[in-house]
């Protein structure tokens, strides 16, 4: 298929650009995907290049940004790495892991990325677009841009914004966040920095996160339309629903919505945290309050502690040790505390971490082997190749239930025979996916490689009941609200709000 020759035959793509990072591009795309699905169309999300450590694994083991996976759920389809052909995963020190079509193909510095990776990156994007249209000839792509489309020092190497828009001749929407202030300057400045042929692609402007009476912006709307000759097709009100943030900048502002909590959870905010969407199911539990822990403190006020995934496990373990948090966690464990580690968190709960190939943050030979927190008799060695796959297994503890999720990690974890006094048991029928042990004084220490473990409703409910029992709280006998149903409800509510305030009619011809 010659995509360039067939562009006149395909349904016109819709592309969402933003005046800045955090303007609301991801949520706007998610909402439009669900709106079009409900209208009987075949929307497919696409983002040529994303930078995020919040990842998803598709059914073929391909790695992609979690935000595009969510957008696929909004479309009612399975996520595929072709929806996000380039994923950059920051590793610190201005370096990133480069993933093309779901597979890790190397690392690069910010300085060298556009010099070495621009041409192959653009070819990968075109290859993905061609494949999507070959498999789905009646689809309509809903494309997300990145940051601002007019970063003048980078625009000649743009892989995500106007290059894609021009290639597909997409109908573009420009979204801006009025909550941050300065929307008039942002809109006019963005449009003024575009070339005439680029500006012609902008077919509508969206004002996002407006607080108060929408009619109060009517004069502002008229001014923008008169100045730009582009219609303001939507003024989206401030939405209070929880929704997974795309990157760690948003994570800092994310707070639990639970008010009448019975269980207080502390999650360690690692410098290189990854896959923080693992905890969205807990955010949606009415009885749970989540707090993010950023520095050394007495942890005794928490009912359980979570050590999340990490993109740089050695580096983050050194942070825990140097900050005093490692000792805080050990003290918490000795005081009947409940702890669970996920992926890198599991590895850090072990006795040793070895990084012979400098894959997980070791800076020199003295850091190639370091001690873990030492609560589980496990040792981890990091190798050159990482494991990415979907998981379907059964749990043994804290209940017997079907478990779905995914693995995405470097390193192999085995029992540390030198710590035979620390007895542990498997959590799953697949014995290498997780372990737990009960403290002599009460409390449990557990760790698993499965991302998405808390999305499994029965498992989550029984783990929470384990904590409730330790607090002498009544066991919750009713079934937990299905997280996947809750996620669908959030997407529906998001789409309904956008549909009320967004005029897409002219884009659906």
UniProtKB/Swiss-Prot annotation:
Domain GATase cobBQ-type, residue spans: 262-459
Protein keywords: Cobalamin biosynthesis, Glutamine amidotransferase
UniProt protein name: Cobyric acid synthase
Family that this chain belongs to: Belongs to the CobB/CobQ family. CobQ subfamily.
Catalytic-site annotation from UniProt: 343, 451
Pathway: Cofactor biosynthesis; adenosylcobalamin biosynthesis
Pfam families: CbiA, GATase_3
